[in-house]
Amino acid sequence: MLAIEDVRAYEVLDSRGNPTVKAEVTLSDGSVGAAIVPSGASTGSKEALELRDKDERFGGKGVLKAVANVNESIAGEILGLDAFNQTQLDDTLRELDGTKNYSNLGANATLGVSMAAARAAAAALGMPLYRYLGGANASILPVPMCNIINGGAHANNNVDFQEFMITPFGFTSFKEALRSVCEIYAILKKELANSGHSTALGDEGGFAPNLANNTEPIDLLMTCIKKAGYENRVKIALDVASTEFFKDGKYHMEDKAFSSEDLIERYVELCAKYPICSIEDGLAENDFEGWIKLTEKLGNKIQLVGDDLFVTNEDILREGIIKKMANAVLIKPNQIGTITQTMRTVRLAQRNNYKCVMSHRSGESEDAFIADFAVALNTGQIKTGALARGERTAKYNRLLEIELESDEYLGEKL
């Protein structure tokens, strides 16, 4: 075995200029792993706690408490542990925190250490991270769900839906799929500029124009897909993030108040008109009856993804499976706090034929851990923003590297 010999953390910046935690783990052979923890803007209420300082520094968003928890509390407990026993490490982190949502240490502290330790162990074996975490069966390049028009909490515009994505499923390689997205993205920029719209970018690298309603972005994407020559090879996916505009039992958007039934019918109409393959968080995280109805209505036709609904939590997902809510789960490691817990949620989903989508957060960094993680777990899909901004392209570029070693692209088999 190789023992964990040193652990340290410090404050760095994410893509929004907010502080986040960077952790480094050193093993007894000198191998080092490092990781930067992401941060979300629209968050589910049941997510693991992201510990912030709430003082005068950085408008209260500093993470020195989480950093201190790594350096002072966590380090002393995990030094000497077997670096190759990820489960033991992560279970130790959970026990040390003592809460279900990491409200003592902070999930930004525990996840940083968990990720960094996995990287150090992979480095010690001379293995790529995806192979170390996934073993011999880690081979499938995921279909990217590329968010090229931003709205909601990710943009300063008047569009309610949070993400308008394109999914290049009709290709035999990841690099060709990515090329199609690049070409569509370039055409979209020209279309927006020519029509007098802003080409400013949102948090995730997509364009963030003011548009008439939540349908106009879809029309724009369809125009660009057609001009690029990729009809029937690229579909549309939406992240509605409806919890953000759910209040007093109604969904408030486009200057109207919609019931769950109204919104479901809106989705049915959209799916009949456009090649929509996936809707994420179509209803609010606590609108359970609505979710059951939505799944009954569209669950056999498209992918219905639970993000705020499930928050990458194995126990919550299990309840959702029993109640037949959604048919897919978004996977965000920082929602749950460790690598092991993330893997358990993915395995539960896969055993029950729920699809998985590995996902970034809107506050990201140059760390490309989730690219390897998506391949390791054969999630088959990944969300990591538009093809702009370095914190987004870092993940795409890492997947292009992985494709040189493992060239199976899920594509039409999705």
Curated annotation (Swiss-Prot):
Enzyme Commission designation: 4.2.1.11
Pathway as given in its UniProt record: Carbohydrate degradation; glycolysis; pyruvate from D-glyceraldehyde 3-phosphate: step 4/5
GO cellular component: cell surface; extracellular region; phosphopyruvate hydratase complex
Keywords recorded for this protein, A-Z: Cytoplasm, Glycolysis, Lyase, Magnesium, Metal-binding, Secreted
Active-site residues from the entry: 204, 332
Binding site residues for (2R)-2-phosphoglycerate: 162, 332, 361-362, 383
One biological process term in Gene Ontology: glycolytic process
Cofactor(s) in the UniProt record: Mg(2+)
Cell location: Cytoplasm; Secreted; Cell surface
InterPro entries: Enolase (IPR000941), Enolase-like_C_sf (IPR036849), Enolase-like_N (IPR029017), Enolase_C (IPR020810), Enolase_CS (IPR020809), Enolase_N (IPR020811)
Cofactor comment: Binds a second Mg(2+) ion via substrate during catalysis.
Pfam families assigned: Enolase_C, Enolase_N
Domain of life: Bacteria
Sites where the protein binds Mg(2+): 239, 280, 307
Uppermost EC category: lyase
GO MF annotation terms: magnesium ion binding; phosphopyruvate hydratase activity
Catalysed reactions, semicolon-separated: (2R)-2-phosphoglycerate = phosphoenolpyruvate + H2O
Function per UniProt: Catalyzes the reversible conversion of 2-phosphoglycerate (2-PG) into phosphoenolpyruvate (PEP). It is essential for the degradation of carbohydrates via glycolysis.
Family to which this protein belongs: Belongs to the enolase family.
Name listed for the protein in its UniProt record: Enolase
Native species: Campylobacter jejuni subsp. doylei (strain ATCC BAA-1458 / RM4099 / 269.97)
Underlying gene: eno
